[in-house]
Swiss-Prot record:
Name of protein: Putative L-lysine 2,3-aminomutase aq_1632
Protein's organism: Aquifex aeolicus (strain VF5)
E.C. no: 5.4.3.-
Family recorded in the similarity comment: Belongs to the radical SAM superfamily. KamA family.
CC cofactor note: Binds 1 [4Fe-4S] cluster. The cluster is coordinated with 3 cysteines and an exchangeable S-adenosyl-L-methionine.
InterPro entries reported in the protein's UniProt record: Aldolase_TIM, Lys_aminomutase/Glu_NH3_mut, rSAM
Cofactors (names): [4Fe-4S] cluster; pyridoxal 5'-phosphate
Amino acid sequence: MGKKLKYIIDLKFIEEIPEEERRELEKVTEKFAFRTNTYYNSLINWDNPNDPIRRIVIPTTEELEVWGKLDASNESKYMKVHGLEHKYPDTALLLVTDVCGIYCRFCFRKRLFMNDNDEVARDVSEGLEYIRNHPEINNVLLTGGDPLILATFKLEKILKALAEIPHVRIVRIGSKMLAVNPFRVLDDPKLLELFEWFNTETGKKLYLMNHFNHPRELTKEARKAVELVQKTGTTLTNQTPILKGINDDFETLKTLLEELSFIGVPPYYVFQCRPTAGNKAYSTPIEETIDLVEAVRAEVSGLAARVRYVMSHETGKIEILGKTDEHIFFRYHRAADPENRGKFMVFKRNPEAHWFDDYTELVAEYKSSLSGVS
């Protein structure tokens, strides 16, 4: 399959979609880009119109419902130079590509795949210079797009440049490639050699932040790719949004977290689906989702249970801690403003809320003593 894998950017090449349905779905792809591949399509049960893998990659007319913003977390606010975001003091994001192995229908950066977008830096030299000039940055996240879509020699140039910056200790690669095209790893020993070099020869550490959304993505090929990357000394973790019709039921989420822990890819975050344009069909109410997450955490091992349920809000990563009959509790896990670090907030419940901004009745807030620590 690896060498024969083909990418598909036009629905007309997917024979399993009837022509009448395809014409309706093309109204969606005129607005939001479409991309899949033959390997990922092979995971779909085409007899089930609500198949979760299908929902991840095949458009639905529900995406045309007006809702949310293209830049729901206002990432542009933190763009310091072309292609670089600097939101938290110790962390920089480099947007290195505007292409992925597939385009998830719920992507919070779907704006990058639009013709008029210019946020990604194909030449990262300006971003690298910014990092060199900011010694507080000790870890860099390569993102996009999917950095593993880049040719290995291009990724090598970026990693070698980062390896030469003394204060950068950790490089993270945010990628769904092992889920959507594990042959990127299986068929490219040079990529594995690059990862091993970075971990053993630079005095620094590489992390691969995976995006497995559903247990059926954990195929034998994906598991083998995980194993090969682990052998390079790279640490693997996973993060996924909670997605309606994909992983928002107890058994699916429990299985996903358990299997990830078993193969050595411990869950890191489960995210509230961002209110990005086109995403309403995938978003779940916060107060239902916290019940789901807590129920699953109560039934899995400690390795899986340590996952945090958070929102990537404009102001920072806000953890959803729990609720009572009347109130819901939040805490800043990461805050852009030092004054908000560790802040604990109590709001009156809102069963219709899908995002932090939907909570308007603040009951109490408590500043952490951390806010004064530097």
